[in-house]
Amino acid sequence: MKKLNIALLAGGNSSEREVALASAAMILDAFDRSRYNVIPVDVHGLHWTCKGAGDRKVEVDKTDFSVPVGDGKIRFDYAFIMIHGTPGEDGKLQGYLEMMGIPYSTSGFVSSVETFDKTLCKRIVSEIDGLCLAREVLLRRGDRVDADAIAARLGLPVFVKPNASGSSCGVTKVKSVADMVPAIERAFTESDAVLIEEFIEGRE
């Protein structure tokens, strides 16, 4: 039986890059090598590389999702995405792979786009009858920050978080007005927009 060529896409561009690489290393050990030819691909910005002979980095040809080997090339049959944050969870990789006609391991392009952007996701689910959502303030890079006005509108504490990020990186529970701006600045290191939500006490 012909082995399937699997691209194990790891790394990414977020602050979780090293965690994603470590996760991919564990996944790599779990593949049945008698059935799959697994090639780890480090995705970092526009550079998608895998190890060639002598640990030489080889660039993936993104025009046909292949990797050069000797005088030929290996075309990937499937993509296993092990990237936290962008571009593995926000629809970028999913959109590319769908254009290439390559099946992959995560949710689809549309659902990835709609759920990675927290504000967009809230707009969509707000149409569900009976579903209550936390009140919010959305800030975009360059917006004027009025911490007193935000606290007056939402109360304290509030949660300050990147609007588009793959995990809890950059998330802060803010209990005072004085801590608001530093928390917003921290969230902006992870995303171009920051979502501030009221605190809702309850059981998760």
Please provide the spans of the model-predicted regions.
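ATP-binding N-terminal substructure of ATP-dependent carboxylate-amine bond-forming enzymes
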Residues: 1-110, 114-116, 120, 124-127, ...
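Acidic/polar active-site rim loop that often engages polyanionic ligands
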Residues: 101-104, 131, 162-169
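Basic phosphate/pyrophosphate-binding loop/patch that engages nucleotide-derived ligands
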Residues: 124-132, 186
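ATP-grasp fold ATP-binding core
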Residues: 125, 151-171, 192-202
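Short beta-strand-to-turn element immediately C-terminal to the catalytic PLP-Schiff-base lysine
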Residues: 139, 171-176
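Phosphate-binding site of ATP-dependent enzymes
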Residues: 175-204
